[in-house]
A protein has these predicted regions:
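Flexible glycine/acidic-rich beta-alpha junction loops that bind and position SAM and/or redox cofactors
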Residues: 24-25, 80, 84-91, 120-128, ...
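Short, hinge-like loop/turn segments at secondary-structure boundaries
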Residues: 32-33, 133-134, 163-167
Length: 199
C-alpha cells in the first residue's frame, strides 16, 4: 500500500488529500494502520488530514488515536467565514456555533487540540463581518488556534470564471506562491498565486 511505501522510505510527514477524512468507518481502519506503522518503524511521524464536518464520532475517534500517538496537531474545525452573505456567495454552510462550541468542549476535555481556519477576502465578507466572525469563534471556545488564509483564485474554478469575478467585483494580486512543507531550495520554476485583494 502507499502508506507502507511511505513508512519503508522513512517519510516523516503524510498530508492526506481526502477533504472529508472520517466520513467512512474505513478511515478509522486506515488510522489504525498508520498508528501501527509508526509504532513499528517510527514512520510516518505526522499524519495530517482535513476532516469531515458531519461525522463527529468517527472524527473524534480518529483524532484521539492520532493525538495519543503524537501524530497530529489536532482536529480541524474550519469555518471559512461566519458571514451568511460570504457563505452564500461561495456556496458553503457551517456547523452551528452551538454545535461547534460543544465539539470544542468535548475535544478540550479529551486534551485533543482543535484549530479553526478562516478565509480572508471571500466575496461578501466585510472587515466588520470578518472581525465579528473571529470574535464569535473565540467566544464559542476556540482558544487554541485560528489560522487565517488568503482567498486564492484557482484556474478552472467557479470563483475563477470571468462572470463570477465581474459579479463580485473581485480584484486580484499576482504574488509568488508560498510553499509550505517544502525545502528551502530555490525552485527553477517560479509559481504564482492569484490572491483576492478586494471584492
Amino acid at each position: 500500500s502507499e502508506l507502507k511505501w511511505l513508512s519503508d522510505r522513512k517519510i516523516e510527514y503524510c498530508f492526506c488529500a481526502d477533504a472529508n477524512f472520517g466520513m467512512f468507518t474505513r478511515d478509522i481502519e486506515i488510522t489504525d494502520y498508520l498508528v501501527g506503522l509508526k509504532k513499528e518503524s517510527g514512520y510516518p511521524d505526522v499524519f495530517r488530514a482535513f476532516y469531515d464536518k458531519n461525522s463527529d464520532d468517527n472524527v473524534f475517534e480518529i483524532c484521539k488515536k492520532l493525538n495519543d500517538n503524537r501524530m497530529d496537531k489536532g482536529a480541524t474545525m474550519s469555518y471559512q467565514s461566519l458571514s451568511d452573505d460570504a457563505l452564500k456567495n461561495v456556496n458553503r454552510s457551517n456547523l452551528t456555533v452551538e454545535h461547534f462550541s460543544s465539539l470544542v468542549a468535548k475535544y478540550n476535555k479529551a486534551k485533543i487540540p482543535t484549530y479553526s481556519e478562516l478565509i480572508l477576502g471571500l466575496p461578501g465578507e466585510t472587515c466588520d463581518s470578518f472581525c465579528d466572525g473571529l470574535s464569535e469563534l473565540l467566544e464559542a471556545g476556540q482558544h487554541n488556534s485560528v489560522s487565517v488564509y488568503y482567498c486564492e483564485i484557482l484556474p478552472n474554478s467557479i470563483m475563477g470564471s470571468g462572470e463570477y469575478i465581474e459579479k463580485y467585483g473581485i480584484e486580484v494580486g499576482h504574488v509568488k506562491f508560498n510553499h509550505i512543507h517544502s525545502s528551502d531550495e530555490k525552485s527553477e520554476v517560479e509559481e504564482y498565486s492569484d490572491i483576492v485583494m478586494s471584492t
